[in-house]
């Protein structure tokens, strides 16, 4: 119920006022006292709440990748020119979609079929195309019934976690991509179980910790792997993937692999698909077109289901996901129709290679500039298109700052950092106010590590070099400001 905010004049005796509140309580309505119950000789009823709190645990969590945009836009209104390094949208950063891809999509729009519903699990021809690609590699064999399309992987992630019993948990990497973390917390209403990605060892996962936690926590039923990783850019070698599969097999778990960036690997790094190593372990691979095509606005992703026929419990879980999907009828038809036509176009492979070469150059530019910055732990990115740097925590405190010339901008930033926020977020806000460079605090990826994530998407390499050098100089200036 909304707050009544009803004003009671001072002729109303306080005893009667209290009686009214008692009646509300008897009717099952909770009363939340207001600071203005008695003000200026007048009594306010304050706020009447619903019978009980209807918001689920986790309703106060934020998605900082987007939340930082709100802050940046307010600074833009104050005259700050913003360099957007916060979100992985290649198109927003200037990626030009090739004409041949646009022509394919334009042609599909002319087909009446693109305006119709698709089957609940996805367009038959597209699922058959994906199945052929998976089976051709010679690993686990699937059928079109093992493919389910969603309106983006955010939708797939939400469905996959919400279909799990609330007392069953998926262990996730730390740091981890925000959407997975939020989905796990919201489904269970408890903080997640995590296994560490170690920045001192090139962001390798601590597989001993993973197995120890799986062994000691019977509530863990699944393991999440993001390969290549977001936010760290770590690319899992085949050996590590096989070890994780073996852990799942030993302890009767299922696997969720987010393989959004599986075809976006460079710097000589090598990895393999989950389907190549999964064997007979129940698993889900999540893939999409947002980053690879890139077509983030299409909101099109899918699950590949492995070995549901080998585990009755896992099969029931997948059936729950599918029944939830049926309530939505289907996913958007147009991008599904485009997938086979774009991926089989003779220009597609070379187009992707050229993009990867660009990310490789930017990865090395960023690494070579940041690796020598005091107080930072930096690893070269070999997959996806993000660079993550970690502060040595001993050097951060709440007295540090960056000088900001414009008073209105400075006042706004100082107001933000006065709210007892994480120390890396404090740096990010000062960086944004002082330089206009918008990055994401690493603690937003639900880790105790303090740092920041930036993208490798800038098309102008000279501008990108300036951005990274400015960040490096700002880190040094920020650290030195409180000494």
Task: Identify the meaning behind each predicted range.
Residues 31, 35-49:
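Short, Lys/Arg-enriched N-terminal segments with co-localized hydrophobic residues
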Residues 42-47, 132, 136, 140-141, ...:
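PLP-dependent enzyme catalytic core of the Aspartate aminotransferase-like
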Residues 49-152, 159, 206-209, 342-345, ...:
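N-terminal small-domain helix-loop-helix segment of the aminotransferase-like
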Residues 103, 276-360, 364-373, 377, ...:
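Conserved core segment of the aminotransferase class I/II
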Residues 113-247, 256, 262-277, 284, ...:
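Conserved core of the PLP fold type I
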Residues 336, 356-367, 377-394, 401-415, ...:
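Conserved glycine-rich beta-strand-loop-beta hairpin in the small C-terminal domain of fold type I
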């Amino acid at each position: 119920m909304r707050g009544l905010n009803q004003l009671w004049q001072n002729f109303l005796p306080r005893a009667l006022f209290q009686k009214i509140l008692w009646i509300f309580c008897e009717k099952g309505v909770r009363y939340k006292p207001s600071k203005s119950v008695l003000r200026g000789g007048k009594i306010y009823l304050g706020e009447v709440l619903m019978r009980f709190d209807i918001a689920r645990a986790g309703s106060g969590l934020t998605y900082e990748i987007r939340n930082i945009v709100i802050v940046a836009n307010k600074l833009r209104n104050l005259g700050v020119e913003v360099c957007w390094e916060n979100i992985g949208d290649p198109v927003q950063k200037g990626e030009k979609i090739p004409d041949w891809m646009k022509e394919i999509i334009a042609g599909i729009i002319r087909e009446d079929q693109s305006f119709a519903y698709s089957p609940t699990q996805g367009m038959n021809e597209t699922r058959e195309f994906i199945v052929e690609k998976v089976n051709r590699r010679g690993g686990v064999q699937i059928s079109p019934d093992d493919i389910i399309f969603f309106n983006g992987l955010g939708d797939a992630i939400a469905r996959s976690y919400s279909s799990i019993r609330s007392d069953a948990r998926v262990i996730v990497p730390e740091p981890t991509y925000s959407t997975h973390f939020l989905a796990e917390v919201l489904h269970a209403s408890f903080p997640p179980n995590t296994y560490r990605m170690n920045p001192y060892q090139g962001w390798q996962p601590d597989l001993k910790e993973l197995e120890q936690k799986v062994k000691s926590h019977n509530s863990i039923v699944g393991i999440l792997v993001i390969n290549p990783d977001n936010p760290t850019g770590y690319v899992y070698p085949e050996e590590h993937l096989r070890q994780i599969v073996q852990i799942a097999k030993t302890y009767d778990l299922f696997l969720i692999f987010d393989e959004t960036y599986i075809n976006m690997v460079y710097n000589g790094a090598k990895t393999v698909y989950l389907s190549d190593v999964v064997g007979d372990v129940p698993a889900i691979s999540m893939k999409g077109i947002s980053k690879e095509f890139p077509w983030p606005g299409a909101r099109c992703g899918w699950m590949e289901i492995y070995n549901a026929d080998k585990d009755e419990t896992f099969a029931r879980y997948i059936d729950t996901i599918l029944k939830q999907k049926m309530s939505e009828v289907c996913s958007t038809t147009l991008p599904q129709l485009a997938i086979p036509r774009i991926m089989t176009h003779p220009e597609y492979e070379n187009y992707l290679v050229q993009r990867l070469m660009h990310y490789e150059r930017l990865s090395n530019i960023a690494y070579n500039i940041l690796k020598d910055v005091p107080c930072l732990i930096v690893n070269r990115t070999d997959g996806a298109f993000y660079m993550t740097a970690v502060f040595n925590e001993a050097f951060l405190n709440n007295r540090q700052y960056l000088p900001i010339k414009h008073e209105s901008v400075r006042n706004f930033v100082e107001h933000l950092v006065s709210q007892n926020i994480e120390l890396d977020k404090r740096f990010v806000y000062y960086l944004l106010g002082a330089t206009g460079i918008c990055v994401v605090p690493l603690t937003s990826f639900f880790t105790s590590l303090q740092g920041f994530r930036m993208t490798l998407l800038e098309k102008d390499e000279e501008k990108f070099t300036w951005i990274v050098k400015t960040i490096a100089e700002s880190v040094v200036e920020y650290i030195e400001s409180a000494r």
